[in-house]
Amino acid sequence: MSTYPINAPGQSADAAVLIVGGGPTGLIAANELLRRGVSCRMIDRLPVAHQTSKSCTIHARSMEMMEHIGIAARYIETGVRSNGFTFNFENTDANALLDFSVLPGRYPFITIYNQNETERVLRHDLEATYSFQPEWGTQLLALNQDENGIRADLRLKDGTKQTISPRWVIGADGVRSRVRECLGIAYEGEDYEENVLQMMDVGIQDFEAGDDWIHYFIGQDKFVFVTKLPGSNYRVIISDLGGANKSNLEETREAFQGYLSSFDDHATLDEPRWATKWRVWKRMATAYRKGNVFLAGDAAHCHSPSGGSGMNVGMQDAFNLGWKIAMVERGEAKPDLLDTYHTERTPVAQQLLEGTHAMHEIIMGHGKGLTDRIELTQAPGWHDAATYRVSGMSYNYRDQLVSFNDDRLAGPSAGDRIPDAELAPRIRLFDLVRNTRPTLLVAPATEAEVAEAEKLRDLIREQWPLVKPVLVRPQGSEESIEGDVHVDSYGQLKREWGDNAKGWAALLRPDNYIHARAGLDRGDLLVQAIDAMLVRCA
């Protein structure tokens, strides 16, 4: 995996980028900047990192991101693998599943991993690779920007004040974002007034539903969520309608036991490790960018926890933004590229809010009866649509990149997720695009088109040497010893990318999306797409 040299300590006072917030969104942003040689500094007002967390699901699209970064195996080795969700409605056999085995790729499941542990893995990777650490107990007091740049006033852990002038700021500081407040950006939406969620990590004896699925137990006026966590504990969440609103842990355990027993009269809760409660919001920032300051994660959007997508979408915000800031900062990409962060990610957040609200109404539509909620889970197409949305695999940027798509081609379009394909033993497409820079994938359909494919590859390599070329010859071709030439040995590239009679090429982004795709006879479309993104070689 190619990386740039690091020219400055990650947390130097004169770092190019200030990241406010030390959670998963901020940590992914730091990774994307540092691996491209852009210095950054991360601050968080908390005195230490979180030791507990509410989020515990890493979905398929995020696992592909973790693979791209190089740390997916750590989550697989120590996480709990869940097949998906069960919806168990009270007093009926009309139950439903969201079975994640239908998903494409290497991660057709949910990885259960506490957010605080997810953060720990990311922090350790940043420290080991870049000697980078968040600055805990450091608070953003004020943030201003004008024609002279950005001014950020900080209070350090020892109480002293410091003023810095980063060129960029990423606000990943949660639902009560100080960055968003300083920018004067509205956070519009509503609260789910009827829903206070209460959560507990606790051992369970004789839990009959099993550990291979995440379980929703749904009654007309209540619900219980249960999933196995790494180690011996389970995560249990209930809707709080007053009965579980207790002040001490033992009373809380008794209330949880009562809720769980109404669905499973054999399961018994042990002494809880910890418990918490929170109110559910549905809100979204009216803008993700103001000048050189950006919002990401919960600072930009929050929603019902139904489906467990929140942490995942926040990390994907950072994965979309980090490489763009880095390439603009380095003079490799045009500044207009940064406008695409808002235009690409706000529709995703809107879909997220709508999708989580729909699932929220099934799980926590208290007082609305079960019949309509059950019918929603039986509707044609509901299973696959919900599974792809919750996993993050359905989100795309087709509308934003439609002008860079050749609609004659079968298979994925510009704006879609990059489909993986095994090209040869121990060589997968994902291995070839694990770069800090864009990749040009050129795929002639026949040996007769190889010369034309090489001509397009060489043209783009000459004008944009930053782009990594990968040429994949059709199945049956002789193996090549060239480093950037491969063979579709098993025909998987053809199956995953469409059975096209003519060859094609695609510009693949560092965040695992297709930026442009066109037939070999439309090389001008590829040139136009690259020219819109990158600075030409002088």
Curated annotation (Swiss-Prot):
Signals that turn on the gene: By polychlorinated phenols.
Can you state which reaction this protein catalyses? pentachlorophenol + NADPH + O2 + H(+) = 2,3,5,6-tetrachloro-1,4-benzoquinone + chloride + NADP(+) + H2O; 2,3,5,6-tetrachlorophenol + NADPH + O2 = 2,3,5,6-tetrachlorohydroquinone + NADP(+) + H2O
One MF term from GO for this chain? pentachlorophenol monooxygenase activity
* InterPro entries reported in the protein's UniProt record: FAD-bd, FAD/NAD-bd_sf, RIFMO-like
The keyword Disulfide bond is assigned to this record: no
Enzyme class name: oxidoreductase
Any GO BP:
pentachlorophenol catabolic process
Give cofactor(s), names only: FAD
Q: Does the keyword NADP apply?
A: yes
Entry EC number(s): 1.14.13.50
Keywords of this protein's UniProt record, alphabetized? Aromatic hydrocarbons catabolism, FAD, Flavoprotein, Monooxygenase, NADP, Oxidoreductase
Could you say which protein family the record assigns here? Belongs to the PheA/TfdB FAD monooxygenase family.
List the PANTHER family hit by this protein, alphabetically. Answer: BINDING MONOOXYGENASE, PUTATIVE (JCVI)-RELATED (PTHR43004:SF19), TRK SYSTEM POTASSIUM UPTAKE PROTEIN (PTHR43004)
Q: How does it assemble?
A: Homodimer.
| Name of the protein in question | Pentachlorophenol 4-monooxygenase
Say which species the protein is native to: Sphingobium chlorophenolicum
